[in-house]
From Swiss-Prot:
<dbReference type="GO" id="GO:0006412">
    <property type="term" value="P:translation"/>
</dbReference>
<dbReference type="GO" id="GO:0003735">
    <property type="term" value="F:structural constituent of ribosome"/>
</dbReference>
<keyword id="KW-0934">Plastid</keyword>
<keyword id="KW-0689">Ribosomal protein</keyword>
<dbReference type="GO" id="GO:0009507">
    <property type="term" value="C:chloroplast"/>
</dbReference>
<keyword id="KW-0687">Ribonucleoprotein</keyword>
<dbReference type="InterPro" id="IPR044958">
    <property type="entry name" value="Ribosomal_bL32_plant/cyanobact"/>
</dbReference>
<dbReference type="GO" id="GO:0015934">
    <property type="term" value="C:large ribosomal subunit"/>
</dbReference>
<protein>
    <recommendedName>
        <fullName>Large ribosomal subunit protein bL32c</fullName>
    </recommendedName>
</protein>
<dbReference type="InterPro" id="IPR011332">
    <property type="entry name" value="Ribosomal_zn-bd"/>
</dbReference>
<keyword id="KW-0150">Chloroplast</keyword>
<dbReference type="InterPro" id="IPR002677">
    <property type="entry name" value="Ribosomal_bL32"/>
</dbReference>
<comment type="similarity">
    <text>Belongs to the bacterial ribosomal protein bL32 family.</text>
</comment>
<dbReference type="Pfam" id="PF01783">
    <property type="entry name" value="Ribosomal_L32p"/>
</dbReference>
Length: 59
């Protein structure tokens, strides 16, 4: 016969949610930092190609 599982405590649920949110926050910070370095032209570890269309638009 099927038996329902025990309920997860509020504290355990809150800890898991906090860990998940912190991982998302770290990814957000890293992506924003990379975007800033690309826009300012100081990126050392990220290489990308520019096309003629892009360079004509900036002039």
């Amino acid at each position: 016969m099927a038996v329902p599982k025990k309920r997860t405590s509020k504290s355990k649920k809150k800890i898991r949610e906090t860990v998940w949110r912190e991982k998302a926050n770290q990814a957000r910070i890293k992506a924003f930092s990379l975007a800033q370095s690309i826009l300012t032209g100081r990126s050392k570890s990220f290489y990308y190609t520019t096309t003629e269309k892009d360079s004509n638009l900036s002039e």
